């Protein structure tokens, strides 16, 4: 089974990448705590799924204390997305959404 962890900067394209991965046949889950990844993979294997991915978002970091331990045990492919600050700023200005890491100076938060 292929197991992928998709993460990166807020506004860097995780939602778009998730859609592409789903189009490639990945079963994707958002912000599932790492301690639940092994049961997810067991269930996926039992159902014959060949590709599973999880999206890790900065807003869910409180649930990710055991991330390093689980990454070592499962050895997933990790995809980290980033973009230039001016691109992130433009995307947030287009969507008019509040940056998930703070409502202060947007450029500083990026």
Curated annotation (Swiss-Prot):
InterPro entries reported for this sequence: P-loop_NTPase, RapZ-like, RapZ-like_N
This protein's record includes keyword ATP-binding: yes
Disulfide bond annotation, renumbered to this chain: none
Residues engaged in binding GTP: 57-60
UniProt xrefs under Pfam families: RapZ-like_N
UniProt binding sites for ATP: 8-15
Protein's UniProt keywords contain Nuclease: no
MF GO annotations: ATP binding; GTP binding
SUPFAM superfamilies cross-referenced by the UniProt entry: P-loop containing nucleoside triphosphate hydrolases (SSF52540)
Key words of the record: ATP-binding, GTP-binding, Nucleotide-binding
Function statement: Displays ATPase and GTPase activities.
Annotated family: Belongs to the RapZ-like family.
Name assigned to this protein: Nucleotide-binding protein in fmt 3'region
